[in-house]
Amino acid sequence: TTTRYTETQIRSMINNNMTILRYFRLKDNFGDNGLISSLIIKRQAKILFIDTWVMSCRVLSRGMEEFIFSEIITMAKCLKSTMVRGKYLPSKKNKLVSSLYERLGFKLIKKEPDGASYWELNMKEPLPKISHTIKRTKSKDLDLENWR
């Protein structure tokens, strides 16, 4: 999404119960890719707003985008969110994912003159059938029952 934050800003988000920070690692047949994606999601009443979604281009199209999307949907359901929204800010490096929200079933709600676009997924409507083959491993810091 191209939004950049300082270390100080990230540290303040850690202590904010309206912000959810998640990271993802990928180990597959090609090897251990390590940390490959991070999310910053802001809770706004019954809306989850994907403020930042960064991902290493070396793992694109291996199903990780769909896996992370399914994690966002699980999170939204646990929090009883009615809407998931996201933004796309175009840059030289992220053209590969310019259609990601559309591919994941989000609807375009706003497009800015600078190319920024805003997307939403209504949790009350039938959700898109997105498949992936990624399996979650146990994580000591992930508790689906207690999202902040």
Where are these regions (language model features)?
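A conserved beta-strand-loop-helix scaffold within acyl/acetyltransferase catalytic domains
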Residues: 1-58
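Surface-exposed alpha-helical segments enriched in charged/polar residues
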Residues: 11-15, 70-77
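Generic recognition of short, well-ordered alpha-helical segments
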Residues: 36, 67, 96-99
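Short strand->helix junction
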Residues: 58-59, 91
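Terminal substrate-recognition subdomain of acyl/acetyltransferases
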Residues: 74-148
